């Protein structure tokens, strides 16, 4: 909480956007767009073409094509376009999901099951690349934020 006060004193604003859900916020983080632009506007949304409810954090198949659902370029795609490699990491169970394909598109996804594994992979990535973009997602940190309802 002390950091929030320090930021306030320096007029630094941190905003996860609205709605403040993991799905919307992560898509905004990786695209630089607000939910109304990237299309992931909440945890669950009804697909207007099929009427099916889509839970953004579950697998979307066969109802939604991730490339069509989330159309904004990601930071990883922008980096790749100028020759900069990208890495994204999360739990192994996220590999190949619609959300991973939509939000981390353009990055090489590596599934990991521990923070040690993430940091080892991160170190290897930067040992092999002079520059790059890397994103690490650790769900326990996300869950802690939700459970403490820290504002």
Regions found by a protein language model. Give the residues of each.
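Short, intrinsically disordered, charge-balanced linker/junction segments flanking boundaries
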Residues: 147-151
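His/Asp/Glu-rich, glycine-adjacent segments
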Residues: 2-132, 137-146
